[in-house]
Amino acid sequence: MINSSRINLNSYFCSIFIVSIVVISLICSEALQIQEAKEPIRGHLTRVTIQNDNDYLLGIHCKSRDDDLGFHILAKGELFGWKFHVNFCYSTLYFCGFSQGQMKKGVFEIYRANRDFYRCANCTWKAEKDGIYGYSEDPVKGYLFYNWLK
C-alpha cells in the first residue's frame, strides 16, 4: 500500500512538472513571437538638406561620429541631403565643413539633437553670401546660424 501511494505521488509530481514545462514553453514562445514583431527602438526619422544659394561652387563634407557622408560639390541651386534616426540618448550630432574658394569656409554643427530635435524634422540649410541659414518647418523664414569664417 505504501509503494502504491508513493508511485501515485511520484506520478502526480511528474505530471505537474511536465505540464509546468509545457506551459512555460508556450508562454516563452508567445513572448518571443511578440518581440520579433516589434520594431527596434529608434528615434523619429530626421531629414537634413543643404542647398547652395550662391553663384559659386560650394564644397561640403559632412560627418557624424559613425558616418562619413563624403565630399560633395554643389552648384547654385543644387541640394545634398540625408536622413537618419535620432539615437536613443538624443546625442546625435552631424557637422559639415563648407568651402567656397579661399574666403568663405567653416565647420559647423548642422544637426545637434539637443538643439534641433524639436526645431525641425526636415532641417534645411542654405549657404548664402553672409553665411549658413537654418530653416525649420517654415521654409520661408530662415535664421542666420553661422557666419562664414575668414
From Swiss-Prot:
InterPro entries: Self-incomp_S1. The keyword Secreted applies. Keywords: Glycoprotein, Secreted, Self-incompatibility, Signal. It is found in: Secreted. Pfam families: Self-incomp_S1 (PF05938). It comes from the Eukaryota. Its main location: secreted. One of its GO terms (cellular component) is extracellular region. The keyword Disulfide bond does not apply. One of its GO terms (biological process) is rejection of self pollen. Glycans are attached at residue 122. Belongs to the plant self-incompatibility (S1) protein family. This is S-protein homolog 24. It comes from Arabidopsis thaliana.
